[in-house]
Amino acid sequence: MRRTSATLRGRARPRWRAGNTTPVPVNQTGTCAQLHPPPQGTLQVVRGDGTSLGTVLIFHCPSGHQMVGSGLLTCAWNGSTVDWSSGSPVCKAVPPHETFGFKVAVIASIVSCAIILLMSMAFLTCCLLKCVQKNERRRADRTAQLWYQLRGEDLETVQAAYLGLKGHNHNNSSSVGGGNGGPSGGGGKPGIQHSQAHDNHSFTTDPGDIREQAGVTHSVDKDPWTFRMGTPGPGGCSSSPGTYVMVHALNSAGLAPGNPGRPKVYLPG
């Protein structure tokens, strides 16, 4: 009987492993308490059935909320009992003033980007306008310079032709006057006018210049169709007295309508 009781006692005693200070629990079928998701949060079972030993749970909170506590819980031994690794977390709402600074920063960055873009566009527009205005100014200067050059060449041509015509008419008047009894004779004037009219048929000018010169002669003399060479002309020059210079503009249709007997204009001296 004594040997039998000693054997039973030896079997009932727990055996200790060498190098291990924690005894192996006798109860290997422990479970953890059932957990529920926090208010306005969710619960996800990653491993296990939610209460058995070795179960892993993950908690989630929606946007605008902050989790207070650990979001990962595990069912494990805690000493001689089975319990969760930490307490159940809570989802706490984030106050609005905490997100106000972030919103202000985002709005300020957007506004600054828009201002930079507008300033860049304004700068580019001003540069383009300046380039266009500079090109237009150069073109206008070139046009004006060319117009003045052409105008000066036309004036030199007209003056050269007029000076040559005046010398030729003076020679004709001298020759005709000498043949009719001298320059003071009364019979020399018709011959002078005839030779002048005959010689001036070969001298033509632009109709626009004719109209401009006709307006000038009208302001100088009472008769717009005659201009005496003894009087000073618009250019300030005068010629010998008693000589008339007539300029006829040749037209393919003949003389001007309504005034067949008179020339269109006289060239002033």
Swiss-Prot record:
Pfam families: Sushi. It is found in: Cell membrane. Residues 1-23, 171-237 are annotated as: Disordered. Keywords: Cell membrane, Disulfide bond, Membrane, Sushi, Transmembrane, Transmembrane helix. The chain crosses the membrane at residues 104-124. Residues 125-269 are cytoplasmic. Disulfide bonds join C32-C75, C61-C91. GO terms for cellular component: plasma membrane. It comes from the Eukaryota. Residues 30-93 form the Sushi domain. It is a single-pass membrane protein. PROSITE patterns: SUSHI. This is Sushi domain-containing protein 3.
